[in-house]
Amino acid sequence: MVAGSGRTYRTVYRHLLTRVDPEVAHRWAFAGMRAASRVPVAPHVLRRAFVEPDPRLRTRVLGIDFPTPLGLAAGFDKNATGISALGNFGFSCVEIGTVTARPQPGNPKPRLHRLVADRAVVNRMGFNNAGAEVVARRLRQLRAVPPVHPVVIGVNIGKSKVVAEADAAQDYATSARLLAPYADYLVVNVSSPNTPGLRDLQAVEKLRPVLRAVREAADGAAHRHVPLLVKIAPDLSDEDVDAVADLAVEEELDGIVATNTTISREGLRSPAALVAAAGGGGLSGAPLKERSLEVLHRLAARTRGSLVLVSVGGIETAQDIAERLDAGASLVQAYTAFIYEGPGWARRVLGELAASRSRRETDRPS
């Protein structure tokens, strides 16, 4: 059934969705997933079709039990409107957002472009979201009626565009205060290329007060320790990656999410005219694989197991997942592969990962 659904999706994607504006196509597809999950028996049917995680894939990270190490990266569900639905399609964790303290429309459209030859997406969405207060209300309602199949909920927070850099720490803290009570973990996003000046906050002297303000606000509002991670860009120099890693250890963060999208366009297969037409913004997907893995290796060597590392960027196959886990990641996330491969993708790669682990255990000398 999963293989069939994958073929059907790719046919629909090729003949219909690629003819539609990518943002509209995303809205249609996401609405369809939510609608399917609202049918009374659908969650059970979908879970049987798309999930059934192998017990060998279970992992405990951040004090949380994850049925598998694969989560959906931030950006797909910006406003917490489809967490349970997405869990039905095989993700053990859904990271919502990016959410800002103030609601904002994001950047002008069109702001999402496909580079199909590269299996990549270019976005300059600009943190379009309903704002922390609205998203917190949705999360509170979700927590009040637990789903049949619980999903780990990560919340990714960013700076409101209208807020000056000098006030960034308090802006992040406002989001943390509202959202932390309903989050399994929080991610401070200082690495999107689509909010002017945001990446400047990755500098240690600017990042430190943001992290401290978020931690104090989150733990105070939730009356518990809320695991806190920071998400970094792949475009940081190796020295800057080291500096952020050192800061994360020094400030006793729980982990690092690496990496966000890239502003680089090197090595793309798509025609130059198509790349130029896509314009600026962050590129995700297969071209990010090499740099994302490089950053992971560097972080693992620098932090020596003292932080949880969540690897994101260019993950498409079970082999990619295994490679990231072997390189030091505790969890992995994906987004672009889900867009290109469709609803059966997560279960397929997780099944292949479980089979690979089984073979490794069988081949291990006794």
Curated annotation (Swiss-Prot):
Swiss-Prot/TrEMBL catalytic activity: (S)-dihydroorotate + a quinone = orotate + a quinol
Localization, UniProt: Cell membrane
Pfam families membership: DHO_dh (PF01180)
Membrane topology: Peripheral membrane protein
UniProt keyword annotations, A-Z: Cell membrane, Flavoprotein, FMN, Membrane, Oxidoreductase, Pyrimidine biosynthesis
Subunit structure: Monomer.
Role this protein plays: Catalyzes the conversion of dihydroorotate to orotate with quinone as electron acceptor.
Name assigned to this protein: Dihydroorotate dehydrogenase (quinone)
UniProt source species: Kineococcus radiotolerans (strain ATCC BAA-149 / DSM 14245 / SRS30216)
